């Protein structure tokens, strides 16, 4: 995900590290959600959302000079990582006007293209300075989503990562912006497109993208476990745990980061592939999509349960279960139709069998597998985003992938989208009005957040 260049008329306060500007007040859009104790017994929580720091206007602490424009840094203000952090400030956001982000009660709508801005990434806040932390173990997480306006190549994602609740302020005193300004992001790709990591800029080694006018790849990445509850559009969906060797955020260097942004995908300390359950990829082509069993033309409720071996909030993660509720009917997740792979939930046995059946390298097991994922689930931050994919055009989600593989081979077909349909150039020009709407977030013990 990438910051988009903004222009404001501003003066900023000077200080001595990753700074905060004063031109646009930072007002987090309110978003309510519910904490449940038993079925039908839920209490409303008053939260808010904050946009990631990577999208924000970054300018000189002394005036309105951009520190970053398009996909390049200002070399005078940012000759190195430390100087850049001292010289540059993040400013507040116009959520609706600049980023196409609006809230109403429990509803969050993310628009795809707004002016020059493409996509967004938002975090749920506990208060103005702190991300909301969740312990997913022995709990379920439920939300409503409308994906009807998400065509091929787009991803309206809801997921968790093991970010610091304060955005890294206490660990890295040079970070003066913190969670209030959306700092501290990490995930299992160890993303190197972040402009700041651990309170320092990522300008050293920065290479502007050849395909994305707003993004680039820096010398460092930010790694942490990632639980993808929902990566989806109107064609395909996947739920995917991604463990890492460390349960909290760490910084990596260069191609040793692995993941999407590096020469060697599996060189890092995280699992960039995960163990995914995509109904189409698992052989059921009539389960999810327009007019299918889970009909993406209508809003749906998505329930994800994190079962522990001993039924406690600190037990070992043993299973991730998915079900849906639509039009008052509970719909069990589709069952695998792949030879040698059984079940309709994510377990250690499922993941081992799936990797074998698809001929995929088992990086999931290498980095701890399901139990490793479970160790990170006690302190997770909720993320909601909309994005397109400059690396592989989202074909890993909704098309056949790898592109040169036999589509009849197990695991290659992931959805009905044609090659090229999801190219960012196409979706940004043909579907700028695409959007995703999340609402009615509920969290509580198993069985407490839905009826049916």
Curated annotation (Swiss-Prot):
One of its GO terms (biological process) is cellulose catabolic process. It is found in: Secreted. Residues 405-431 are annotated as: Disordered. GO terms for molecular function: cellulose 1,4-beta-cellobiosidase activity. Residues 1-17 form the signal peptide. One of its GO terms (cellular component) is extracellular region. Its EC number is 3.2.1.91. The active site is at 226 (nucleophile), 231 (proton donor). It is an enzyme of class 3 (hydrolase). InterPro entries: ConA-like_dom_sf, Glyco_hydro_7, Glyco_hydro_7_sf. It catalyses: Hydrolysis of (1->4)-beta-D-glucosidic linkages in cellulose and cellotetraose, releasing cellobiose from the non-reducing ends of the chains. Keywords: Carbohydrate metabolism, Cellulose degradation, Glycoprotein, Glycosidase, Hydrolase, Polysaccharide degradation, Secreted, Signal. It comes from the Eukaryota. The keyword Signal applies. Glycans are attached at residues 81, 284. The biological conversion of cellulose to glucose generally requires three types of hydrolytic enzymes: (1) Endoglucanases which cut internal beta-1,4-glucosidic bonds; (2) Exocellobiohydrolases that cut the disaccharide cellobiose from the non-reducing end of the cellulose polymer chain; (3) Beta-1,4-glucosidases which hydrolyze the cellobiose and other short cello-oligosaccharides to glucose. PANTHER family: 1,4-BETA-D-GLUCAN CELLOBIOHYDROLASE A-RELATED, 1,4-BETA-D-GLUCAN CELLOBIOHYDROLASE B. Belongs to the glycosyl hydrolase 7 (cellulase C) family. This is Probable 1,4-beta-D-glucan cellobiohydrolase A. It comes from Aspergillus fumigatus (strain ATCC MYA-4609 / CBS 101355 / FGSC A1100 / Af293) (Neosartorya fumigata). The gene is cbhA.
